[in-house]
Every structure is written in C-alpha cells, then in structure tokens.
Amino acid sequence: MRNAFTLLFETIEERKNNPLPQSYTNYLFSKGEDKILKKIGEECSEVIIASKNNDNEELVKEMVDVLYHCFVLLAEKNIPLKDIMEEVTERNGKLSRVGDRREIDTL
C-alpha cells in the first residue's frame, strides 16, 4: 500500500515528466533549483513562526508545505523517495549520544 508521501512524490515526478500548464509544481521546475530552495527557506520560516505562535493547526499546514517543497527538490535532483525512506529506516532505533553531535548554540 502506498502512503500519502509516496503518492505526493509520484504526483511531483509525474508533473516533472509530463508538465501540465498552470501547475505550480511545473512552475517550480521551470524556475529551477534556486527557486525551489528559496521556497524551502520561506516555508521553514513559516514553520518557525507558527510554532512560536503556538498555532498547531498552522504548524501542520506549514510542515506539509516544507515537505512538499523538499520532495520537489528531491525530484529536481533525481533522488528517489526510496533513498530517503531507506535512510530513515536505517536511522530508526539507532542510539545516538548527545556527545556525538555538534553543540546547539542558543539563540
């Protein structure tokens, strides 16, 4: 059974391979990687604002926007979703020690 992420990614790849006029996804592909990256940055900022405002409904919507634009980037770079899924699966359940990671600077 395909999940929502798989279906979304398949739709994005379909738009890339068979462009539809007036498609926002095709607009992003036509503008290229810089535009896609800019949109990811904008959407990440909106996630931060929604979280700081304690607006969980808006936070969910903005997180979906981030994921969508990240999926567009993956398609642009010809990285299959299965590569991401495999990486998540590999990391799942691994014990990570705080000392193994860089220090997080406070704001």
UniProtKB/Swiss-Prot annotation:
Coiled-coil residues: none
UniProt-listed Pfam families: PRA-PH
Gene Ontology biological process terms in this record: L-histidine biosynthetic process
Major location (coarse): cytoplasm
Enzyme kind, highest EC tier: hydrolase
Subcellular location as annotated: Cytoplasm
Metal-binding keyword on record: no
Pathway: Amino-acid biosynthesis; L-histidine biosynthesis; L-histidine from 5-phospho-alpha-D-ribose 1-diphosphate: step 2/9
UniProt-listed Enzyme Commission number(s): 3.6.1.31
One term under GO cellular component: cytoplasm
An MF annotation (GO) of this entry: phosphoribosyl-ATP diphosphatase activity
Record-linked InterPro entries: HisE, PRib-ATP_PPHydrolase-like
Domain of life of the source: Bacteria
Keyword annotations of the record: Amino-acid biosynthesis, ATP-binding, Cytoplasm, Histidine biosynthesis, Hydrolase, Nucleotide-binding
CDD domains (UniProt xref): NTP-PPase_HisIE_like (cd11534)
Keyword Amino-acid biosynthesis: yes
Catalyzed reactions: 1-(5-phospho-beta-D-ribosyl)-ATP + H2O = 1-(5-phospho-beta-D-ribosyl)-5'-AMP + diphosphate + H(+)
NCBIfam families (alphabetical): histidine_hisI (TIGR03188)
HAMAP family: HisE
Family from the record: Belongs to the PRA-PH family.
Protein name, as recorded: Phosphoribosyl-ATP pyrophosphatase
Taxonomic source organism: Bacillus cereus (strain ZK / E33L)
